[in-house]
Swiss-Prot record:
Laminin EGF-like domain residues: 286-341, 342-397, 398-444, 445-494, 495-504, 690-723, 724-772, 773-827, 828-883, 884-934, 935-982, 983-1030
InterPro entries per the UniProt record, alphabetical: EGF-like_dom, Laminin/Netrin_ECM, Laminin_IV, Laminin_N, LE_dom, LMN_ATRN_NET-like_EGF
PANTHER family membership: LAMININ SUBUNIT GAMMA-1 (PTHR10574:SF270), NETRIN/LAMININ-RELATED (PTHR10574)
Modified residues annotated as Phosphoserine in this record: 1149, 1493
Species name: Homo sapiens
Laminin IV type A domain segment(s): 514-689
Cell compartment(s), UniProt: Secreted, Extracellular space, Extracellular matrix, Basement membrane
Role this protein plays: Binding to cells via a high affinity receptor, laminin is thought to mediate the attachment, migration and organization of cells into tissues during embryonic development by interacting with other extracellular matrix components.
Protein's UniProt keywords contain Lipoprotein: no
Protein name: Laminin subunit gamma-1
Amino acid sequence: MRGSHRAAPALRPRGRLWPVLAVLAAAAAAGCAQAAMDECTDEGGRPQRCMPEFVNAAFNVTVVATNTCGTPPEEYCVQTGVTGVTKSCHLCDAGQPHLQHGAAFLTDYNNQADTTWWQSQTMLAGVQYPSSINLTLHLGKAFDITYVRLKFHTSRPESFAIYKRTREDGPWIPYQYYSGSCENTYSKANRGFIRTGGDEQQALCTDEFSDISPLTGGNVAFSTLEGRPSAYNFDNSPVLQEWVTATDIRVTLNRLNTFGDEVFNDPKVLKSYYYAISDFAVGGRCKCNGHASECMKNEFDKLVCNCKHNTYGVDCEKCLPFFNDRPWRRATAESASECLPCDCNGRSQECYFDPELYRSTGHGGHCTNCQDNTDGAHCERCRENFFRLGNNEACSSCHCSPVGSLSTQCDSYGRCSCKPGVMGDKCDRCQPGFHSLTEAGCRPCSCDPSGSIDECNIETGRCVCKDNVEGFNCERCKPGFFNLESSNPRGCTPCFCFGHSSVCTNAVGYSVYSISSTFQIDEDGWRAEQRDGSEASLEWSSERQDIAVISDSYFPRYFIAPAKFLGKQVLSYGQNLSFSFRVDRRDTRLSAEDLVLEGAGLRVSVPLIAQGNSYPSETTVKYVFRLHEATDYPWRPALTPFEFQKLLNNLTSIKIRGTYSERSAGYLDDVTLASARPGPGVPATWVESCTCPVGYGGQFCEMCLSGYRRETPNLGPYSPCVLCACNGHSETCDPETGVCNCRDNTAGPHCEKCSDGYYGDSTAGTSSDCQPCPCPGGSSCAVVPKTKEVVCTNCPTGTTGKRCELCDDGYFGDPLGRNGPVRLCRLCQCSDNIDPNAVGNCNRLTGECLKCIYNTAGFYCDRCKDGFFGNPLAPNPADKCKACNCNLYGTMKQQSSCNPVTGQCECLPHVTGQDCGACDPGFYNLQSGQGCERCDCHALGSTNGQCDIRTGQCECQPGITGQHCERCEVNHFGFGPEGCKPCDCHPEGSLSLQCKDDGRCECREGFVGNRCDQCEENYFYNRSWPGCQECPACYRLVKDKVADHRVKLQELESLIANLGTGDEMVTDQAFEDRLKEAEREVMDLLREAQDVKDVDQNLMDRLQRVNNTLSSQISRLQNIRNTIEETGNLAEQARAHVENTERLIEIASRELEKAKVAAANVSVTQPESTGDPNNMTLLAEEARKLAERHKQEADDIVRVAKTANDTSTEAYNLLLRTLAGENQTAFEIEELNRKYEQAKNISQDLEKQAARVHEEAKRAGDKAVEIYASVAQLSPLDSETLENEANNIKMEAENLEQLIDQKLKDYEDLREDMRGKELEVKNLLEKGKTEQQTADQLLARADAAKALAEEAAKKGRDTLQEANDILNNLKDFDRRVNDNKTAAEEALRKIPAINQTITEANEKTREAQQALGSAAADATEAKNKAHEAERIASAVQKNATSTKAEAERTFAEVTDLDNEVNNMLKQLQEAEKELKRKQDDADQDMMMAGMASQAAQEAEINARKAKNSVTSLLSIINDLLEQLGQLDTVDLNKLNEIEGTLNKAKDEMKVSDLDRKVSDLENEAKKQEAAIMDYNRDIEEIMKDIRNLEDIRKTLPSGCFNTPSIEKP
């Protein structure tokens, strides 16, 4: 089929309905022609019915056919009529485009000239009744169908049917039957009809289109409304509206029409019967129920209506959510039936259609989710238990208390009706003094006024207690407090008990006592001081009976209380200090220190007007101050209750300010301090009586009982009491110092050791713990803990062993003569070339040195090792043996050894230098390994006879080339001591740029001159044609004429010569003729000079243009110079970035290795007894802190390494851009060089042309002058006119000469300027090349910096290793001290040697710092540009400082420390693996590093960290050595204190609950991992959806089609 988007208009009318259909079709066509997007409203904007345009809904829509010919290919024949006529047969092949007849041809464009059709298989393949073929058309959306038309390519079927579906998932409904046997085939009456009132949705059957003729081109048109009685009232017929609605159309072909000849089963006949349809058209409109004028594709590529009239849905079949005021209806011609909005009074955006409401009110919109607490179908009233003050305001909740109000509904003002005893607008609270709101009202409060504040809680009745009071009614003191009284702002007084007990009560037997001064007799011990503490005068008045101070300056003076007010005044705590005071002037200036109390190292003060006191005045006023720390009495600084009582318990000073202005006086009287004392009188209830714990005694727990001592003696009664620690050798001790009275040969403050000359374990607690030492002379001894063997501990220097029978490490000899005669132990002699801290430096028997350092060897380390040279006995290690460093290429047999004294290597022939690393002058090729070869430079051609040390290329004279400078360069000549000269042959005029030996060039035809740069006579230079061209033939006459003029000129010159001599006489006529001839020649010369002038002017114009061009080129060169400078800067930055990045990786690796080694080396065992004087607990603690610090550094390194990895990519990208910029610069330089050569050639051409013009003009001028001279020498035989003309000629010649001179001068100036520009350009080019070379060297410098950083890292690691070795030795030393006291004393004697080793280690550290400093210097360049990095570094430093402080505050138990270190080591190993992976990534991306200004700063910080780490480690070792050096003065009390602190630290470690925190972190990590997995799953689902959408998009058509109206022909 070649179908059309528009259905065929020519349907044959039949029946009574066709005129109506014609009118409807015409109206539809007119409506579609004027269809527009806004036709759903009329010109006044009122809604009206609108419909999409009438279209062929089947156009280009895919039809699904259940049978199609061509698979496999088959033959069919065209039916031509009666039997016997020859049939025309063809082939149907689905694989051949021109032979296929697929279902797509049913709905394609209908072209009558080229008909296409769908075709089924033939009857030969079994296509005939009862088998059927279905053609199914899926419209993709509901349409209002007007007709269905089929055009058959063969004869029409005998029987076929049309079906439709109203919904895509609905059943197939018969639409129409066509059959010549309706009753037999479809059980339908033939040509039936529908009566009025009948079922208008039934399908009819007709035989009208079932004839076999025509054999082709037969049409079948089905009109959906034809024969339906309600078609004239379609808008009011829901049955017909449903009838015309279809989403799918199916045509079922049931039986073929035949001539009956198929009964003979002739294959050719059977091949002529088949179904073939050329056009399948469905006329209708997209179904939108009158509420849309168009349909369009949605986001899912589905066809939907573009709904108006507040409707929505695929077919506009529903009202929008808020437009439910009336039921949805289909639009009609009379009414648009648009959906109307609900009336919710602006308080809701949601509603639904309420049929009951619609029937009762005419408005069916029932609002939901009313806002502002409104209710009703239209949100017109407040909800229950809500109110509003105005109709336009929101409703507010009454909030009436359900307990305290009589009703939950309030009045229009929001006030509730309260029950008796309840108050408030909401009846939600009790009246003052009542509590517990219930159904019966509120109950009265029952608070104790001494311990409560204000009223009770209105909900629970619980009273609000003072700070130190508890109980429902605040009727008792909290534990640790006593003496409940109303005057106390805290209610109760805290127990003091010197901090040892929190249980106390009121003491019995104490009465009120006042300490006072009334000044009736004298000043009563009071004195005065100035502000700085110096004494001041005090006056006592017998008349006023007071004391006074007078100030003559602005600085105040104070009254100082006497001793009776001081001392132990803790019984005045919570009581008052009062005095009477006045001043003589009202001008007062108060301060925060008007009343000052001092004691127990504490100091508090208050202003005079504090605690409600008045300003000082001229009238005597009594001032009262309560001695209490409560905030109501603002003593500053604020103290705790215990601190305030501690101050009063040792009160050392009371100061009362006396003067408050300059030159004023203050008067003090009646000072009273309330206190208490034992005895009868008014009871003093504020005195405590403590209940003391075990070991304490006294009313205030201020004493230690017998058998107990002060834990910290210098704290006095504030120190805790602990049991006497005498190890069973004493039952009592001094209660203040704790020193035991030892017996049983024990000694020490706690009897913790044996007396001198005794050995044993005095801590066992028996009388036989200490036994006499078996050593000679009763010297000291010790017991080996494991073997219990007694060994002597005070052997002579250099000896060791259980009985001093062996030489100590570092000594040799045979003290017992076991290997010969007895030889005392002597110090090893190794020429100071051993490490004094090392073990086994020499053989203890022979003294042979075994561990020589500084590259030395020999029995006494007295010579250099092979491959080294120098002085092995030099005092400075740096001056000892150094590596030979012989050059492998220049040394005989590639030896690495040299003279052990001078270091001179054995060189190959013609090789020189101590390391054989250079060739002799005039030789080269050291890399050959066979010695250097002679340069053989030519004596004349080379400059100095030297050559390149690698290539052998000699340095040649200008213009000379060759390996040995033996020949001229191309286009040069004249080989000699000054070099070769350039031929300078003109490229156009010479046959070759190479000249002859005399420098002359071979010229082309028409050129002359040594350089072939001039045209031959009668030749001219044509710019548009290369070379000198011969002048046209006419110029030969000129040449001849010139030859004649030359002959005549010679004759004239001869004549003038003859006139001068007078040898020949000339007649007047002859002279006149010759004069006229001369005049003509002069005129010709003048014309030639004028022509030369014009040529010169043209030349000047050309020179001006050249100058302009040169200026622009110079400007561009300047830009290129700037680019080169920027490129150099960028290259320098890139070099620094690469260098810093590489160094950063090395530093990170080194820091991790250091942390790992340090962490692995801190596993120390705890000594068995902390009371041992040789205990090395401090050493173990320092090791633990060292491990913690290295762990922190390792964590920092991991983070820094990751940052370095990230920033390395940026650094490399910058380097690539820099190199790309350098390549671009090199290209621009090359281009500029080429343009410069072009400009230079043009300038040279102009110079040559100017020179030729100059020569021609000069010759012309000379000739003119000569002619004038000749004329001037003639006798005045002619007229005056001739003379004037001659003068004019002379003047013109002079002017011409001046003009030529001026032009020549301008040209020379221009040429000089050109030379300057040329030099400047050459310099710029050279500078560009230099900058490029500098950029090329940056990578080499980066490599060198990397090597330097690696060397620095190596030195740092070596230094750290040496320091660790020292630490290990010290740990070993710790073990030996515990085993043998004698060995410990010997180690103390070695401390100077150890200090020397530390000095050498410091020296090596400084060397490492210097090596690291070179890397840090480069990084410092970015310091000012990295404020953020500094902030980060500062934060890290603060964090490290905090960590160190925390480590110093806690001394963890050594065994727990070992476990912690093991865990930390595992973490370090994991961090190392992670860092290794990061480093591998960094190595792969090393050359892709980027702008690393931040990375450079971080590299500097890390370099500094490395340096500080080494320095800190050495400092720790020095501290440890100092502590080792002080072992002989061990403080046993200090050791006990450390042991106690260690136990506290252990408790703190347990309290910190690290295991739980780690577990929590692991759980959080698992949660995060699960969340990440969920995110990954979501991402996978989203990606699947995206891929599905992409597949859908690919199946969509690439465009839309806008075809003509369906009703147009």
